[in-house]
């Protein structure tokens, strides 16, 4: 992605690759330092250059580890991942020599979030990145001594690579936003005429706010369903 880039479809941000140029120097589950974790080490176009990279979604800082130039971020709302899942993104970025963020900071998709560096245990200028498709912020050491999230996914299942120049993608199944089409948006507040989705999409015919139910028509029959608290829209 490039600075300032945004991608929102159906009211949901697409989770974008934070790098303008991506050369993976160590992939997931690889020696020496990624055994058992879904991390990538990424440098830019030229070796040794401290390139900036950008927020893959609108997010807030959760934790920082200054000794290793490391910060944990979480999306403000659920995002769309490259594998089609919609959930919160929690991600860790490492080795930023210029890191100055603090827990609670919020930044918008496309704003600068970090700079490739060598802070901490690093053998060259790069960004170490891991992504969890959940709100779980647990940061756990595995049997190889490497830290990781619960619910980690390989990075080609996480971010879209629109406007990223892939120099070395380690054979990943990297996808564009066009590979994950967005269909009809389902109403979040039910009212008469709302569309709701079970195994298909149905129209709400009547609502009972007092008893927290909605009537839909399924295969020619009216069915009352319990629902989340309902709000009538005049």
Residue ranges and their predicted role:
Residues 56-58, 112, 195-208:
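Conserved beta-strand/loop element in small beta-rich adapter and peptidoglycan-binding domains
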Residues 20-57:
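Short glycine/threonine/proline-enriched tight-turn/helix- or strand-capping micro-motif at secondary-structure
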Residues 24, 59-61, 104-116:
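A structural signal for short beta-strand/turn segments enriched in small hydrophobics and glycine
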Residues 1-13, 48, 130-183:
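Acidic, glycine-rich catalytic/binding loops that coordinate metals and/or anionic ligands
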Residues 200-226:
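SH3/SH3-like beta-barrel superfamily modules
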Residues 186-198:
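Short coil-to-beta transition motif at edge beta-strands of beta-rich domains
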Residues 72, 108-122, 129:
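Short hydrophobic beta/alpha edge segments that flank linear recognition/processing sites
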Residues 50, 54-100, 124-133:
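Zn2+-dependent peptidoglycan hydrolase active-site motif and core
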